[in-house]
Amino acid sequence: MTAQIIDGNLLSQQLRKDVAVRAAALTAKGKQPGLAVILVGADPASQVYVRNKVKACEDNGLYSLLEKYDADMTEAALLARIAALNADPKIHGILVQMPLPKHIDSNKVIEAISPRKDVDGYSVLSAGELLTGLPGFRPCTPYGCMKLIESTGTKLAGKHAVVIGRSNTVGKPMALLLLQANATVTICHSGTADLAYHTRQADVVVAATGRRNTLTAEMIKPGAIVIDVGINRDDNGKLCGDVDFANAKEVASYITPVPGGVGPMTITMLLVNTIEAAERETN
């Protein structure tokens, strides 16, 4: 068996067509969806991510506002900018690119963003809405992972899903989204005694540890769906995920590549959340 590759670029393009249609409809009513992106400092990876987010907005009919600040920007100044954007009717979503310089409290910054504009879905309120099943903004990466799984046509109800990783941005919300879809969910992490014992029982595995070869072929149940959230570098400096892709694809039924799997979906779901924020504001 060789797995079918879940093409995140292709699915992303399909979803962005819908984003563009919805953006055009809002713009026709005089309510063009707007996303503000704030970058503090000059982290090279962050600069690439921010550039991609702004371009995605422009390509799909959203207004984008990019604000770049030096790494010595004070926390108070950043909070003041967020307060101003909270009050700006042209802005429906606010994203502060992480990581922030060490002197700025990222939790305080996230909580300063209006809940109506928290399109990253990182705030305590957004987390609570997800936990209790209330409508709200889902964190973009897990939201994209769910769309990738849905694209296979697999019904998650009754399936056993294993999430490797327990971060607030991916692992925990991923588990909650799978739970909402009626999967039976196991969360594994650095304290899990026998990771392979759990993954070998899983119909779906989501790997989100940030470590190469966290999931190898012998740890995968034949026919499982494998979603690889990791972004790492191999010994040659080439991009790779958390999964040993070359061997895992011979065991899984569906698998996401790195790059070209989860990555493009994260930005797409940011656009979807921004559109939803604008639609709520308009309605």
Swiss-Prot record:
Pfam families reported in the protein's UniProt record: THF_DHG_CYH (PF00763), THF_DHG_CYH_C (PF02882)
GO molecular function per UniProt: methenyltetrahydrofolate cyclohydrolase activity; methylenetetrahydrofolate dehydrogenase (NADP+) activity
Physiological role: Catalyzes the oxidation of 5,10-methylenetetrahydrofolate to 5,10-methenyltetrahydrofolate and then the hydrolysis of 5,10-methenyltetrahydrofolate to 10-formyltetrahydrofolate.
UniProt GO BP: L-histidine biosynthetic process; methionine biosynthetic process; purine nucleotide biosynthetic process; tetrahydrofolate interconversion
Pathway linked to the protein: One-carbon metabolism; tetrahydrofolate interconversion
Keyword tags: Amino-acid biosynthesis, Histidine biosynthesis, Hydrolase, Methionine biosynthesis, Multifunctional enzyme, NADP, One-carbon metabolism, Oxidoreductase, Purine biosynthesis
Superkingdom of the source species: Bacteria
Catalysed reaction, written as an equation: (6R)-5,10-methylene-5,6,7,8-tetrahydrofolate + NADP(+) = (6R)-5,10-methenyltetrahydrofolate + NADPH; (6R)-5,10-methenyltetrahydrofolate + H2O = (6R)-10-formyltetrahydrofolate + H(+)
Protein name: Bifunctional protein FolD
Subunit relationships: Homodimer.
InterPro entries noted in UniProt: Aminoacid_DH-like_N_sf, NAD(P)-bd_dom_sf, THF_DH/CycHdrlase, THF_DH/CycHdrlase_cat_dom, THF_DH/CycHdrlase_CS, THF_DH/CycHdrlase_NAD-bd_dom
Binding sites annotated in the UniProt record for NADP(+): 165-167, 190, 231
Family indicated by similarity: Belongs to the tetrahydrofolate dehydrogenase/cyclohydrolase family.
PROSITE patterns: THF_DHG_CYH_2
A single Gene Ontology CC term: cytosol
EC code: 1.5.1.5, 3.5.4.9
